[in-house]
């Protein structure tokens, strides 16, 4: 698939037969602070509900970002197909979303563009949710407080729209609430169903926190209560991620692997997995800022990945339109 920053391709490691998604970004001026931030933030994150970053590789024409491939496509598509989810199914995915976001925040990374289109699913029967696309994320360790307005209007918190300095972690909570609402209702909470493209109206409704759960949607009072604690205009009074994780609705049928104790033990085990060093990644990004040889097409780039023998990645599905096929979607 192609987007603003480049193309995404599905590739296969010829040794392990494992599939990966590779985002190709043209060398030169496109390798800017956004790209650098995406890579730096993403490479630090190792969690079952976050698309795993593998490495960056330089080809003569492009910077290639190699990451885990989620074969189940977008959560958005699953909702489109279903219309809306039952409360139990919505909770199943919301628990995973909060688990991933909570981990990001513990690593001092706020995503800032959480939406259904940035949540993918793996291919398992009970699908595992995977957060992707860290192009707008901001790490408080590396960066100052977010000031710019990013994101899709439907998901944006009121404090982000008002362009004041805001806490990205608290704004992420709002976006998680929008995601939960869409899963359960099959519509956006602050859009006028008669005028969904009227962004001015959507923004007015967000700023005045004007939403309701339709009568035809049967959800518990606990769920309604949680939504009412997320959709709070004043960020200081909004429920926090740790509070969500203790909310009765969230705790119901919480899988063992979602508990904090289990996740801490898994993270310790994960420390041993080798990762491309920060220095190595930085050096490749710096080199990628120099313009490359533009004579090669995408097939050539993928061939370069193999011929350079970097992890022996081989091109698998020739020129598949990965975006529309639903195999891999990552808005670039």
From Swiss-Prot:
It is an enzyme of class 2 (transferase). The active site is at 113 (proton acceptor). Residues 1-250 form the Protein kinase domain. PROSITE patterns: PROTEIN_KINASE_DOM, PROTEIN_KINASE_ST. Pfam families: Pkinase (PF00069). It catalyses: L-seryl-[protein] + ATP = O-phospho-L-seryl-[protein] + ADP + H(+); L-threonyl-[protein] + ATP = O-phospho-L-threonyl-[protein] + ADP + H(+). ATP binds at residues 1-8, 23. Keywords: ATP-binding, Kinase, Nucleotide-binding, Phosphoprotein, Serine/threonine-protein kinase, Stress response, Transferase. Induction: By abscisic acid (ABA) and dehydration. It comes from the Eukaryota. Gene3D superfamilies: Phosphorylase Kinase, domain 1, Transferase(Phosphotransferase) domain 1. One of its GO terms (molecular function) is protein serine kinase activity. Autophosphorylated. Its EC number is 2.7.11.1. Involved in water-stress responses. Belongs to the protein kinase superfamily. Ser/Thr protein kinase family. This is Abscisic acid-inducible protein kinase. It comes from Triticum aestivum (Wheat).
């Amino acid at each position: 698939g192609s987007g603003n920053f480049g193309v995404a391709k599905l590739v296969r490691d010829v040794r392990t037969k494992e599939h990966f998604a590779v985002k190709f970004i043209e060398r030169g001026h496109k390798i800017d602070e956004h790209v650098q931030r995406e890579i730096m933030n993403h490479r630090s994150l190792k969690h079952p509900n976050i698309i795993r970053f593998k490495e960056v590789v330089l080809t003569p024409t492009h910077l290639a970002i190699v990451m885990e491939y989620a074969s189940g496509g977008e959560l958005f598509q699953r909702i489109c197909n279903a219309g809306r989810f039952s409360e139990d199914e919505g909770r199943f995915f919301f628990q995973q979303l909060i688990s991933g976001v909570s981990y990001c925040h513990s690593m001092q990374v706020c995503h800032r563009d959480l939406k259904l289109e940035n949540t993918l699913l793996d291919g398992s029967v009970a699908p595992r949710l995977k957060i992707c696309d860290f192009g707008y994320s901001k790490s408080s360790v590396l960066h100052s407080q977010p000031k710019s307005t990013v994101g899709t209007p439907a998901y944006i918190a009121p404090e982000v729209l008002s362009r004041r300095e805001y806490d990205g972690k608290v704004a992420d909570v709002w976006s998680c609430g929008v995601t939960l609402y869409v899963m359960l209702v099959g519509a956006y909470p602050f859009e006028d169903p008669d005028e969904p493209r009227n962004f001015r109206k959507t923004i007015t409704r967000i700023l005045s926190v004007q939403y309701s759960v339709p009568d035809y949607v049967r959800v518990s009072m606990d769920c309604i209560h949680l939504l009412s604690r997320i959709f709070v205009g004043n960020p200081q009074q909004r429920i926090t991620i740790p509070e969500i994780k203790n909310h009765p609705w969230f705790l119901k049928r919480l899988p063992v692997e979602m508990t904090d104790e289990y996740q801490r033990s898994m993270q310790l085990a994960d420390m041993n997995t080798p990762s491309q060093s920060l220095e190595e990644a930085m050096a490749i990004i710096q080199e990628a800022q120099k313009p490359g040889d533009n004579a090669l097409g995408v097939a050539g780039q993928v061939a370069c990945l193999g011929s350079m023998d970097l992890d022996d990645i081989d091109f698998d599905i020739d020129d598949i339109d990965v975006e529309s096929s639903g195999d891999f979607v990552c808005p670039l």
